[in-house]
């Protein structure tokens, strides 16, 4: 299953962004070469103060997230495929065969209509043996009301993101300005046991060295750490995929109790995958988020330096060079008896990239009457 490790744009501190512009066609190609043939998104970060002096700004924010949009599931019929013609099966609709000795009412049930498809018995207030019928202390089973459960909503947490940043901006009044900023972010996402911590350090300096030469430099260091990045997509390793296949009569909290309170050992023999009810490939969703972990440690340094040279009246030369170095250490792990991995799974991956871009631009501007000529 794919893992969302983020992208380069997310490494920027929003407090450092001055402007965002879109260049199309020849304008983009002229400035950024063939890679910008289809256009370019240009993000300009902030520089130092425009007026002499020292400025300090501090920002702190907290953001809360909740899963707010849900599929439109039908809630008239319970789990089942509707194919049984056996009246005893329909009457004793259940997920577990119950011998008379373990039934609180003394009536055995052998009818088991296994299916995650939601076209079983209609929700009419009847009582059946079900997945949650077992009393774990007495090992007895009782019939429970056949009711629809919002089985997917109870899984998600309220996500919280804390952002704190401080920036210092300076201008000496003699042609030199600088800016330095620090940002710290801490996130707990809506999927349990997922989130990240990140820090961003940014510095920029601009100096008019003399009347014909100006120098600009910017550098950013970004660090991100996560003990677990969630999987996504249509795969049995994705919690969101797993939830789709849960029967609509089983509350997701049942899977949490199995995992957190040690009931897995009593429900499954050693060596048997911890699967959802009536599944051959979907793991217990809480085992997925607490033990099938995808860690990330990322360090990234990127920046640029530019010289603007006034060669003559209307004639300027821009020399630019930029560097982007990224190093990531990733791990993926699955415990014993994960579906498809009876002996577990562990993987380490180091992803390193270095990109250096340099260019120059010679431009000439001249005003002729009511017209401007640029080349």
What are the functions of these language-model segments?
Residues 14, 161, 173-174, 208-210, ...:
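Outer-membrane beta-barrel channels and translocator barrels
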Residues 2-25:
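Short acidic/polar hinge/loop motifs at secondary-structure boundaries
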Residues 155-159:
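Short Gly/Pro-enriched turn/cap motifs at secondary-structure boundaries
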Residues 1, 50-147, 175, 189-196, ...:
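Surface-exposed loop/interface segments of Gram-negative outer-membrane beta-barrel transport/assembly proteins
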Residues 45, 160, 166-170, 203-207, ...:
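Residues on the lipid-exposed face of transmembrane beta-strands in outer-membrane beta-barrel proteins
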Residues 182-188:
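Transmembrane beta-strand segments that form the barrel wall of outer-membrane beta-barrel proteins
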Residues 8, 30, 36-60, 164-166:
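N-terminal periplasmic accessory domains that precede
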């Amino acid at each position: 299953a794919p893992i969302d490790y983020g992208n380069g744009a997310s490494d920027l501190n929003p407090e450092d962004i001055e402007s965002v512009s879109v260049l199309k066609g020849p304008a983009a190609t002229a400035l950024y070469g063939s890679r910008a043939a289809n256009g370019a998104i240009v993000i300009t970060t902030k520089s130092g103060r425009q007026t002499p002096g020292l400025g300090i700004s501090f920002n702190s924010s907290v953001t809360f997230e909740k899963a707010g949009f849900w599929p439109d599931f039908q809630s008239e019929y319970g789990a089942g495929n509707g194919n049984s013609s056996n009246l005893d099966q329909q009457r004793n609709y259940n997920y577990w065969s119950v011998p008379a000795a373990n039934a609180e009412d003394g009536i055995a049930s052998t009818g088991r209509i296994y299916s995650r498809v939601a076209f079983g018995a209609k929700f009419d207030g009847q009582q059946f043996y079900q997945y949650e019928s077992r009393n774990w202390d007495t090992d007895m089973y009782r019939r429970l009301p056949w009711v629809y459960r919002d089985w997917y909503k109870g899984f998600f947490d309220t996500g919280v993101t804390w952002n704190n940043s401080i920036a210092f901006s300076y201008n000496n009044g003699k042609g030199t300005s600088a800016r330095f900023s620090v940002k710290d972010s801490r996130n707990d996402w809506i999927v349990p046991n997922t989130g990240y911590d990140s820090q961003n350090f940014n510095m920029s300096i601009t100096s008019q060295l003399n009347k014909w030469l100006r120098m600009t430099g910017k550098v950013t260091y970004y660090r991100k750490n996560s003990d677990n990045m969630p999987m996504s997509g249509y795969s049995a390793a994705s919690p969101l995929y797993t939830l789709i296949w849960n029967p609509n009569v089983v509350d997701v909290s049942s899977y949490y109790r199995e995992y957190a309170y040690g009931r897995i050992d009593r429900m499954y023999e050693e060596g048997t995958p911890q699967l959802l009810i009536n599944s051959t490939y979907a793991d217990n969703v809480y085992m997925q988020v607490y033990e099938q972990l995808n860690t990330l440690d990322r360090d990234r340094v990127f920046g640029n330096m530019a010289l603007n040279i006034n060669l003559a009246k209307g004639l300027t030369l821009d020399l630019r060079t930029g560097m982007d170095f990224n190093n990531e250490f990733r791990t993926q792990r699955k415990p014993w008896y994960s579906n498809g991995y009876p002996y577990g799974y562990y993987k380490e991956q180091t992803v390193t990239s270095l990109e250096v871009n340099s260019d120059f631009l010679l431009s000439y501007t001249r005003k002729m009457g009511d017209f401007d000529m640029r080349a």
